């Protein structure tokens, strides 16, 4: 493997169709996740340090041939206050502690 062929680090997440479509079309630039052992195992290493990803792969469902797309991974944060977000015609109100994953451009 040459320096130019460095393997990309990809965070893989599954979405429901309405959120998948809003993200794929560029309207929703934040993915919200309820805190859980599973999501923290993806975002933190065994020492509790944040993992770095190059991209996120979003799939609509769990089937092997489920629709998918990639976007840039810009980092993540934890919601400190209940906040209202509007994406297209959809409204989300987050709770304190909700994990926010920030998306860059769709690739």
Where are the predicted features?
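Structured alpha/beta reader/binder surfaces that contact nucleic acids or chromatin modification marks
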Residues: 2-107
């Amino acid at each position: 493997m040459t320096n130019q062929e460095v393997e990309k680090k990809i965070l893989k997440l599954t979405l429901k169709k309405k959120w998948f479509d809003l993200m794929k079309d560029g309207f929703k630039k934040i993915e919200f996740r309820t805190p859980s052992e599973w999501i923290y195992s993806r975002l933190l290493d065994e020492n509790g340090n944040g993992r770095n990803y190059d991209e996120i792969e979003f799939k609509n469902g769990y089937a092997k041939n489920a629709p998918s797309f990639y976007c840039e991974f810009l980092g993540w944060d934890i919601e400190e206050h209940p906040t209202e977000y509007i994406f297209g015609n959809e409204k989300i109100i987050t709770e304190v502690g909700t994990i926010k994953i920030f998306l860059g451009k769709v690739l």
